[in-house]
Amino acid sequence: MRIMGLDVGSKTVGVAISDPLGFTAQGLEIIRINEDKQDFGFDRLAELVKQYQVDRFVIGLPKNMNNTSGPRVEASKAYGDKIEELFHIPVSYQDERLTTVEAERMLIEQADISRGKRKKVIDKLAAQLILQNYLDCNY
């Protein structure tokens, strides 16, 4: 059983994968997307799904602090609907409030990574945190 975590943004999708037993999450990569050109990285996602034999997706929902939904929540749900349709794999959603903030804090405090380098890995780490939170709550 492998679960893939996704942090869906307007320009990138951070990707993480669980271990086969569903205990830990590991960041994999960042897929570049272009919403204007309707390029959502599904070809690369298909390669990863096949490689890791994914049987569930977890997508972060970027809710507002007052628990309301904004346009990014709708975009994340639309992305989830599309991958469920394309891959016939169930999609779950995980509240991702503050995961990007937590990821940035971790990169600054624990790894002392410069701002430029943080931008290159932050979405992957956010996907890892989203997936780990899901695993901790559900397994």
Swiss-Prot record:
It is found in: Cytoplasm. Disulfide bonds: none annotated. Keywords: Cytoplasm, Hydrolase, Nuclease, Ribosome biogenesis. It holds the Pfam family RuvX. Its main location: cytoplasm. GO terms for molecular function: nuclease activity. GO terms for cellular component: cytosol. The keyword Heme does not apply. SUPFAM superfamilies: Ribonuclease H-like (SSF53098). InterPro entries: RNaseH-like_sf (IPR012337), YqgF (IPR005227), YqgF/RNaseH-like_dom (IPR006641), YqgF/RNaseH-like_dom_sf (IPR037027). Could be a nuclease involved in processing of the 5'-end of pre-16S rRNA. Belongs to the YqgF nuclease family. This is Putative pre-16S rRNA nuclease. It comes from Streptococcus equi subsp. equi (strain 4047).
